[in-house]
Amino acid sequence: MSKKALLMILDGWGIGDQGKDDVIFNTPTPYWDSLLANYPHSELQASGENVGLPDGQMGNSEVGHLNIGAGRIVYQDLVKINRACADNSIMKNPEIVSAFSYAKENGKNIHFMGLTSNGGVHSSFDHLFKLCDISKEYGIENTFIHCFMDGRDTDPKSGKGFIEQLTAHCEKSAGKIASIVGRFYAMDRDKRWERVKEAYDLLVEGKGKQATDMVQAMQESYDEGVTDEFIKPINNSTVDGTIKEGDVVIFFNYRNDRAKELTVVLTQQDMPEQGMHTIPGLQFYCMTPYDASFKGVHILFDKENVQNTLGEYLAANGKTQLHIAETEKYAHVTFFFNGGRETPYDAEERILVPSPKVATYDLKPEMSAYEVKDKLVEAIKTQKFDFIVVNYANGDMVGHTGIYDAIEKAVKAIDECVKDTVEAAKANDYEVIIIADHGNADHALNEDGTPNTAHSLNPVPFVYVTENKNAKVENGVLADVAPSILHILGMPQPADMTGRDLIK
């Protein structure tokens, strides 16, 4: 017997340890407690490999909504590349084969450039090591590494240690460090072309401090009070590792935003006023797609195109849907929920409620939850939508302030909004699933009592509000939510959705 379905996402509302750090447990939530007492509920895993992130990494709203809407685990770039390196399938990657074969057959130099650290935000040290190993396997003599130093996602003087580790790896593998420069120059994202030119001149002309010992050169920089992020260009004078016509370049950053500008000046656009020109015949490989407009560059790991998300599948089957949230989480219930698609599907309506204009949300912990709730209840009463998804942002956005009494106020506001929403839904023939995308307000204090502003690794709730007294629900992951929504709607699950229906 099919019904209409409402999916309520309480952002940052995890299942805590019921200790003093667990604001959700310690705040009176009479309506939430009544739901747990009267309806079937279970737990969803919302972090690490259960949402396509590396093991032990906390979930986030983007990844969470992507998994929820996709109905399958969507593997993030880092995990995909890690897997390819671990099982050696990277050796069969057609673009890897083309890059190394081209260099070998044409006697060209191969260059690896990117953020050389273990920060894990833009790049991975392990990926660079693997590229060196592949170069060794292909027997490519001239393998040059251009190191962009970190100091933002890592300690400001950790770079020297990374250069030592890389040097040691190259000795048993392949590759020579040809140049070093801080990410301040090589990874700008604000069109400060005068910074990018410093990196460009180093890579293309070998301009910079000339050094024979790259580790010593790093230490000299520290001695001068210049740390990793701001390291001035250093060129290895013992090799000619500049990028030349027809060479192969692999930019091993997997995050795109800070890799774009250097890629532009090397491959896309001459900037004569800055003295930068693209290099003819360059075989340029990006780890992931940096920009859809880029021409003539190769992509090692393309984005997964998530087909048949819940939104797409409902639209294809003539169902009506509403996506509603306040500004802070609007992109999450639209773009991310729909698998990275901006434009609405047929018969998909959207309501954006402006978030309050305050410096930090502890100043208005209820945010715009009541306004979202009022608009949502109106929409429920029209009975025109087969499916509705709403996000209440407070648990996460106020949780990020780390201010305990503000988080308490946020939790109380959510309890009231959940009550009005669920009661309206029940009165209008909707079944309701209530979940979170990740934890936050459930872990507001560190062990030493200081505020914890980060997401938690805790599981999140799955509450099924139904008139069916025999219903049971199982534990699962975020990818299991969409199949459970289809169960309520009485629709078959498409093959693309590999999550499972948790309603029994």
UniProtKB/Swiss-Prot annotation:
MF GO annotations: manganese ion binding; phosphoglycerate mutase activity
One BP term from GO: glucose catabolic process
Cofactor stoichiometry and binding remark: Binds 2 manganese ions per subunit.
Catalyzed reactions: (2R)-2-phosphoglycerate = (2R)-3-phosphoglycerate
Pathway(s) where this gene product acts: Carbohydrate degradation; glycolysis; pyruvate from D-glyceraldehyde 3-phosphate: step 3/5
Keywords of the record: Glycolysis, Isomerase, Manganese, Metal-binding
Binding site for Mn(2+) 1: D396, H400, H455
Keyword Signal tagged: no
CC annotations in GO: cytosol
Signal peptide range: none
Binding site for substrate: H122, R152, D153, R183, R189, R255, N256, D257, R258, K329
Protein residues bound to Mn(2+) 2: D11, S61, D437, H438
Entry EC number(s): 5.4.2.12
First-tier enzyme category under EC: isomerase
Record InterPro entries: Alkaline_phosphatase_core_sf, BPG-indep_PGM_N, Metalloenzyme, PGAM_B_sf, Pgm_bpd_ind
Co-factor(s): Mn(2+)
Source species, domain of life: Bacteria
Active site per UniProt: S61
UniProt record similarity statement: Belongs to the BPG-independent phosphoglycerate mutase family.
Function: Catalyzes the interconversion of 2-phosphoglycerate and 3-phosphoglycerate.
Subunit structure: Monomer.
Alphabetized PANTHER family for the sequence: 2,3-BISPHOSPHOGLYCERATE-INDEPENDENT PHOSPHOGLYCERATE MUTASE (PTHR31637:SF0)
HAMAP family associated with the record: GpmI
Protein name: 2,3-bisphosphoglycerate-independent phosphoglycerate mutase
Species of provenance: Phocaeicola vulgatus (strain ATCC 8482 / DSM 1447 / JCM 5826 / CCUG 4940 / NBRC 14291 / NCTC 11154) (Bacteroides vulgatus)
Organism lineage string: Bacteria, Pseudomonadati, Bacteroidota, Bacteroidia, Bacteroidales
Gene from which the chain derives: gpmI
